[in-house]
């Protein structure tokens, strides 16, 4: 689970030049603790704290709750904690991880977002979250959605035995076709 607006809320409060904002956002995307050091100014400790609050849900949420976040970021963190709590309550054996700085592919999202993985399967099964609806260039209400990646899903389900088939070109004699089918 992630909250793409969390870091954005912190960075927007820093009044950084565009190139510094981009460099800092890149350092966060790479989880580059050292790269954050020279760019974050007064938000360095909070941003490093967010990096430390990445991982298995319960310890990550505990670390996240200890951070002194700006108001907008607190709202995003609160939503993340609420959704994670609901997921963990509904499926206590589910492996849930938290990444409060993740936003790659979620830049347009407005709330808690998620990526689905399954152990032993290469790639994401899907991802989704909340995003603004836009009609004819005007923004409207939020929507929620999920994209499932069929290639990954097919790798995740057990394969059945392939059905035996034969190719019978037009004009194949019925006796030959019957013999092939008998094999």
Regions found by a protein language model. Give the residues of each.
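Short, flexible active-site loop motifs that bind/organize anionic cofactors or intermediates
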Residues: 11, 23-26, 143
């Amino acid at each position: 689970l992630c909250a793409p607006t969390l870091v954005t809320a912190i960075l927007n409060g820093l009044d950084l030049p565009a190139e510094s904002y981009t460099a800092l956002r890149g350092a966060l995307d790479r989880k580059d603790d050292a790269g954050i050091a020279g760019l974050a100014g007064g938000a360095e400790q909070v941003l490093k704290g967010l990096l430390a609050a990445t991982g298995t849900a319960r310890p990550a949420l505990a670390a996240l709750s200890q951070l002194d976040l700006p108001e907008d970021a607190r709202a995003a963190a609160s939503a993340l904690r609420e959704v994670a709590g609901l997921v963990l309550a509904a499926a206590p054996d589910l492996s849930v991880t938290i990444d409060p700085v993740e936003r790659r592919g979620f830049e347009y999202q407005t709330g808690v977002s998620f990526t689905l993985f399954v152990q032993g399967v290469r790639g994401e099964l899907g991802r989704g979250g909340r995003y603004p609806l836009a009609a004819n260039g005007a923004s409207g209400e939020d929507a929620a959605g999920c994209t499932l990646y069929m290639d990954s899903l097919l790798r995740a389900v057990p394969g059945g035995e392939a059905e035996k088939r034969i190719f019978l070109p037009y004009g194949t004699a019925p006796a030959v076709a019957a013999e092939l089918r008998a094999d």
